[in-house]
Regions:
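Short, flexible helix/strand-to-coil boundary loops that buttress conserved ligand/catalytic motifs
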Residues: 65
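Short S/T/G/P-rich N-terminal loop/turn motif that feeds into the first structured element of a domain
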Residues: 1-38, 42-48, 56-60, 81-93
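Extracellular/luminal beta-rich ligand-recognition
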Residues: 51
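Conserved short beta-strand edge segments in small beta-sheet-based binding/regulatory domains
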Residues: 71-82
Length: 93
């Protein structure tokens, strides 16, 4: 099974990043084995985070989200790289 990239958009509940950073500091990312963190970007208002994750088992995302859903609302989108998108669309050009 191939690994899939996921763009996870985290919306901090009540626009408050403090509990999220506190939990991450105290307990780490809480990602199950098989779910890999790639990188993340946080908006300058500390209201949301754009996080790139990778796994071959999308159920692991649900397991990970369960650790955070009390303080974060999630959007999860499967994504591909720009290079892969170009490769896939080129036959239609």
């Amino acid at each position: 099974m191939s690994r899939t990239l996921y763009m996870v958009i985290e919306h901090y509940k009540n626009g408050d990043a403090t509990p999220v950073y506190r939990r991450c500091r105290d307990h780490g990312r809480l990602a199950p084995e098989g779910l890999s963190y790639i990188s993340s970007w946080v908006d300058t208002k500390f209201e949301r985070c754009y996080q790139l994750m990778e796994t071959d088992n999308p159920r692991l995302l649900d397991e990970w989200i369960a650790h955070w859903q009390d303080i974060v609302d999630f959007e999860v989108h499967s994504v591909i790289t720009s290079a892969e998108a170009e490769k896939r669309i080129s036959p239609r050009l």
